[in-house]
Curated annotation (Swiss-Prot):
InterPro entries: Hexapep, LpxD, Trimer_LpxA-like_sf, UDP_GlcNAc_AcTrfase_non-rep. HAMAP family: LpxD. The keyword Kinase does not apply. This is UDP-3-O-acylglucosamine N-acyltransferase. The lineage of its organism: Bacteria, Bacillati, Cyanobacteriota, Cyanophyceae, Nostocales. Its EC number is 2.3.1.191. It comes from Nostoc punctiforme (strain ATCC 29133 / PCC 73102). The keyword Acyltransferase applies.
Length: 350
């Protein structure tokens, strides 16, 4: 694919590029690569001026650059064609899609699949080997169900949704259109509902529903639990990493991003566009406002306001957390100084 062809795919975001001043230099691009691993014929990207040293060292043929004239000149000097944009990483993501298409099997129902007679399977659906689809299940048009998936009764899967191998969809689950559930994920299993009694822990039946709205992505080995009553709900276009625990009755807004090993106790409510970095933990019934961000390993025990950035355990405002970190390594010396002052004060009083 010629560099000019790639530019044409970007539309209005691809108007500032090296071909404007040098239209004859239009090399063939055969793939994409990280800038430090790029080879001749590949396209890569640079996010900001601090990565300028990579531009002079890379073997990439083409680069996506920020709107920085110095980087553009440096690329030109090194014979690299370029296109500039306000968001290089976003444009690079679009470029990858030009060279790589995810595996999509041809629609068919494998003879080893077990499908209950009451299940409804839409058109152009792929059902792989050893899939189990139980009674009352509804599968939308164009869905892809990879090998060994188990779908419990009273479940609905939306159009064009993909269920990867070995994931499990429990009863009373509703999954919207264009969702992706990765391998090993478990959607709608019983929430951790036990009530103390004189004879031990009494199991509270989890009779509610688990709802994933359109465009949700769930990573490998993530669990999203079904509540005793009501719903556990994940809003549209929310993306969830591997190994995430979402407790029963959680309400997650639209456009959220939840990184690996984050965990939410029951009844947590996230607003829209919330970001939880890896290993964030949220206590029972906590509310997180729209656009809030929690950095890695944050422990949240109380509500977080919209747009707030928090860090640490227990969670505190991010700027305060940075000050605490700056003091932390000095605590032993500060403690020794305090002991000396205490001794001096005691001696002066004797």
């Amino acid at each position: 694919m010629k560099f000019s062809e790639i530019i044409s795919q970007f539309g209005e975001t691809g108007t500032n590029h090296s071909l404007t001043s040098n239209p004859d230099h239009d090399p063939e691009i055969i793939g994409v690569a990280a800038i430090d691993e790029a080879t001749n014929g590949t396209l890569s990207y640079v996010e900001g001026p601090k990565f300028g040293s990579f531009v002079s060292k890379t073997n990439a043929t083409a680069l996506i650059l920020p709107q920085d004239e110095k980087l553009q000149e440096l690329a030109q000097e090194n014979g690299i064609v370029w296109i500039s944009t306000s968001d290089p990483r976003l444009l690079f993501a679009k470029a990858i899609a030009l060279f790589y298409q995810p595996y999509r099997p041809v629609p068919e129902i494998h003879p080893t699949a077990v499908i209950h007679s009451s299940a409804k399977v839409g058109s152009d659906v792929y059902v792989g080997p050893h899939v189990v689809i139980q009674q009352g299940v509804e599968i939308g048009d164009g869905a892809i169900i990879h090998p060994n998936v188990v779908i419990y009764p009273d479940t609905k899967i939306g159009d064009r949704t993909t269920l990867h191998a070995n994931c499990t969809i429990h009863e009373r689950t509703r999954i919207g259109a264009d969702c992706v559930i990765h391998s090993g994920a478990v959607i709608g299993a019983e929430g951790f509902g036990f009530v103390p009694s004189r004879t031990g822990w009494l199991k509270m039946e989890q009779s509610g529903y688990t709802v994933l709205e359109d465009g949700v992505v769930v990573g490998c080995n993530t669990a999203i639990d079904r509540p005793a009553v009501g719903e556990t709900r994940v809003g549209r276009n929310t993306v969830i990493d591997n190994l995430v625990q979402i407790g029963h009755g959680c309400q997650i807004g639209s456009g959220c991003a939840i990184a690996g090993q984050a965990g939410m106790a029951g009844g947590v409510k996230l607003g829209n566009r919330v970001i939880l970095a890896g290993q964030t933990g949220i206590a029972n019934q906590v509310k997180i406002g729209d656009g809030a961000i929690a950095s890695a390993q944050t422990g949240i025990h109380s509500d977080v306001a919209p747009g707030e950035i928090v860090s640490g355990t227990p969670a505190i405002p991010y700027k305060l957390y940075l000050k605490v970190c700056a003091v932390y390594s000095r605590l032993p010396d500060m403690y020794q100084s305090l002991k000396q002052l205490q001794r001096k004060f005691k001696n002066s009083n004797d």
